[in-house]
Amino acid sequence: MVAVRRPWPVTVAMLLILLACLGALVDAYPAKPEAPGEDASPEELSRYYASLRHYLNLVTRQRYGKRDVPAALFSKLLFTDDSDSENLPFRPEGLDQW
């Protein structure tokens, strides 16, 4: 096999493009709010907690799509018709799990 050697300007250009793309991804993520000092006023603390709550809501928000499938399965099992109950696994009531 013959190794193809790229000239160094092409390699540098590829690295710069990669860094620019990574920089765009980092800017898309929300920044965590900075905590006020220990001698902060109640208004500053209130603003900080509001911005922290907003940040946590953004970071931990629900994402809909393929990950939503187990919830659909759970709702199907929870709200089944009587005709579908024959397909559910049978569990004897006399046996304790402990």
From Swiss-Prot:
The record marks 30-31 as: Cleavage. The modification Phosphoserine is found at residue 41. It is found in: Secreted. InterPro entries: Pancreatic_hormone-like, Pancreatic_hormone-like_CS. The peptide YY form is cleaved at Pro-30 by the prolyl endopeptidase FAP (seprase) activity (in vitro) to generate peptide YY(3-36). PROSITE patterns: PANCREATIC_HORMONE_1, PANCREATIC_HORMONE_2. Residues 1-28 form the signal peptide. Residues 68-98 form a propeptide. It comes from the Eukaryota. The modification Tyrosine amide is found at residue 64. One of its GO terms (cellular component) is extracellular space. Keywords: Amidation, Cleavage on pair of basic residues, Hormone, Phosphoprotein, Secreted, Signal. Pfam families: Hormone_3. SMART domains: PAH. One of its GO terms (biological process) is eating behavior. GO terms for molecular function: neuropeptide hormone activity. Belongs to the NPY family. This gut peptide inhibits exocrine pancreatic secretion, has a vasoconstrictory action and inhibitis jejunal and colonic mobility. This is Peptide YY. It comes from Mus musculus (Mouse). The gene is Pyy.
